[in-house]
Amino acid sequence: MKLLVTGGAGYVGSVCSTVLLEQGHEVTIVDNLTTGNRDAVPLGATFVEGDIKDVADNVLSSDSFDAVLHFAARSLVGESVEKPDEYWQHNMVTTLALLDAMKRNNVRNIVFSSTAATYGEPETVPITEDAPTHPTNPYGATKLSIDYAITSYAHAYGFAATSLRYFNVAGAYGLVGENREIETHLIPLVLQVALGHRDKIFMFGDDWPTEDGTPIRDYIHIRDLADAHILALQSNVEGSHRIFNLGSGEGYSVKQVIDTCREVTGHLIPAEVAPRRAGDPAVLIASSAKAQSELGWKPQRTDLHTIVSDAWAFTSQLGDKAHSASRG
């Protein structure tokens, strides 16, 4: 297939592009490099630097594309609260421009990178796709609004579409892992402490209603995530918009993550308890039963030790060689 990948110089987009190329697909990547990195674009992909809302028509009209995988987005929750205008522009407005360009160029197959942030604070866990959607920040709100837009395009214009709502993506694949200029994810933050780039890791509360008092999250390996995108792409149905949760179905606490990082790296990794953050749920675990049933997807790398080991293999060589890969 000939595929357009937006945001393909970022963490998730570059790994998915790598796997698509390995499977023989032709990949064109569009990225404005705001958070992505040119070095993360895999060999064999055609690269176009630019904002998708400005170049989508030209790119889509230049070749006979079969589908679009849409990863390009701003994704920092805290920043979205401080700069909601930028998030609505970069996420919602840009996606509408992409959808319109797809319609004009008769490319009507799309897989969208959505998020578990669309659910907000869950009423029950594990979280299924029919759980109420009450995002608690502009980032989640923009993604949910895009889901609604895609549904309307599927019904009105025959788009074949899937939205994949990720939980906590982690790990690395090959030469690509998490290396953002502004890091907010727990595993890379802890590994930065192991490398000596940070003094300590903060645990936001140790009095949560969990076994060890720290919040529990569901971590999905980046390679398993890539597999889900390919399965969704291959099974999209004209005039339909499907939504799937993607997680391992297993939960690990903050303390478990820190202890596993200590075990994998051999470093002490100082940790300090800080006050709880407003809006943090105690437990977030996905139900991926629908994806397993309808897509035939089954995560293969659910063990926390495997996820951390792959992340450390990337992070440690990054620290040693001081070269950058994916920042997005």
UniProtKB/Swiss-Prot annotation:
Active site residues according to the UniProt entry: Y139 (proton acceptor)
BP GO annotations: galactose catabolic process via UDP-galactose, Leloir pathway
Domain of life: Bacteria
UniProt cofactor(s): NAD(+)
EC number: 5.1.3.2
Pathway noted in the entry: Carbohydrate metabolism; galactose metabolism
Keywords assigned: Carbohydrate metabolism, Galactose metabolism, Isomerase, NAD
Molecular functions per Gene Ontology: UDP-glucose 4-epimerase activity
InterPro entries linked: Epimerase_deHydtase (IPR001509), NAD(P)-bd_dom_sf (IPR036291), UDP_G4E (IPR005886)
Function: Involved in the metabolism of galactose. Catalyzes the conversion of UDP-galactose (UDP-Gal) to UDP-glucose (UDP-Glc) through a mechanism involving the transient reduction of NAD.
Protein family: Belongs to the NAD(P)-dependent epimerase/dehydratase family.
Full protein name: UDP-glucose 4-epimerase
Species of the source: Corynebacterium diphtheriae (strain ATCC 700971 / NCTC 13129 / Biotype gravis)
Gene coding for it: galE
